[in-house]
Amino acid sequence: VEYAICEYLPGDEFTVDCFTDRHGQLRFAAPRQRMRIRAGISVRSRRFAPDEGILSIALDINSRLAFNGAWFFQLKKNAAGEYRLMEIAPRIAGTMCVARNAGVNMPMLTLFNMFGCDVGIIDNANAELVDRAFISRFETDISYDTVYVDFDDTVTVRGKVNSILMMYLYQARNA
């Protein structure tokens, strides 16, 4: 029997979105806290200013690996509040849209790198929080003329209109 022994990491989890230019210089490192995760993707994430520890880790990774464009790494804090590296990936992260909303278009910058263009980065830092949802929708061949729904805890939930149900009812009526 072989065992993998890992440190318990009870603290917050972070992703740091990075961009390295075609000359190997780290030009952008923007951390965000992974506040809610679904299917491995952060669906609620808050951006914050990088501290010295995060910048040091980003520069160290960048000096050891040959990046050309967008990449990211993930950290988690241990019981003592110290950062522990969990993952490094040379690709666009699922929630890198936070950087895009702040004016930093990582896919485009990466393409410019590949075309040999020098780039400048202007971070507007106007996107602090992203919250998104994955919704499944299905089509069926079941035919029906009437839909019954309960008012309490269906049409209204916690005193507010259930907008997803209302969307379905409008769709059913207009189909």
Where do the PLM segments sit?
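Short beta->alpha transition motifs characteristic of CBS
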Residues: A30-M35, I88-I92, V157-V161
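Non-catalytic pre-domain segments flanking phosphatase-related domains
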Residues: I92-V149
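Acidic active-site catalytic centers that drive phospho-/nucleotidyl reactions
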Residues: Q74, E87, V149-D152
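Short, small/polar residue-rich loop motifs at catalytic or cofactor-binding pockets
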Residues: E13, G69, D141-Y144
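Internal helical hairpin/lid segments
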Residues: W71-F73, Y83, I92
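Glycine-rich phosphate/pyrophosphate-binding beta-alpha loops
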Residues: M35-S45, A89-A102
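Phosphate-binding site of ATP-dependent enzymes
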Residues: V1-L65, K76-R84
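Active-site neighborhood of HAD-like aspartate-dependent phosphohydrolases
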Residues: I142-V147, F151-N174
